[in-house]
């Protein structure tokens, strides 16, 4: 039986735009109380204003790598709503390019936001979930955590780590009525890819893009149905699974996928200029 989120409390990080905002909208439809977290106050205020007619919304502008601030946020959320039931670890950071071209400071930043912060937030929220009698943690990873992408080596590594953490944590918490789910999307049409088309690797364009709304709906479904992992879109998830199981086969397929992606990327670039 699927979970009912009415009057439950859901914490969403990276909630001011894109997938996080989409997940907030989808959870609002279920009647859940929302705790929306992001660095930018203006974006949080905008999404809160949009959703406040549907449900109770609390916002908290903070950096997810500031664990003292995260603890205060959770305490405040519990004080306001009396319970916390779901954590969506969605906040992420991605700096594209070969590792030799990356500013060395970008590497620990990606690790801290994409991997360390979800681990710490999961740890911080556990007492609240146990107090509520159980709950759900949904970690937003990427198909790059199954099939690493050249030009995104550090990002891929963080998502591989988040995937491993999710599966292990699910086993640790199985007897506590706390589920841990993973949502692993491919490229997402949030505008960033098209606005930075020259920085995006050709192979990215070889796969169909999901919308933020589709990923947001998958996050709610994962929490409701206690899914282990939702890889999306399905066709790309199958391809990523093959690449994960057979890296040598993935290397043989990569030139064809890069060529396909280059053609589609050129079409997008031409369309943007017209």
Predicted segments with their positions:
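Conserved glycine-rich cofactor-binding loop
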Residues: 9, 16-17
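Active-site helix of classical SDR
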Residues: 122, 158
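The beta1-alpha1 cofactor-binding region of Rossmann-like NAD(H)/NADP(H)-dependent oxidoreductases
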Residues: 61-73, 104
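SDR active-site lid
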Residues: 172-236
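Conserved glycine-rich Rossmann-like NAD(P)H-binding loop of the short-chain dehydrogenase/reductase
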Residues: 30-47
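Substrate-binding pocket helix/loop in short-chain dehydrogenase/reductase
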Residues: 98-99, 103-111
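Residue(s) in the substrate-gating loop at a strand-loop-helix junction
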Residues: 142
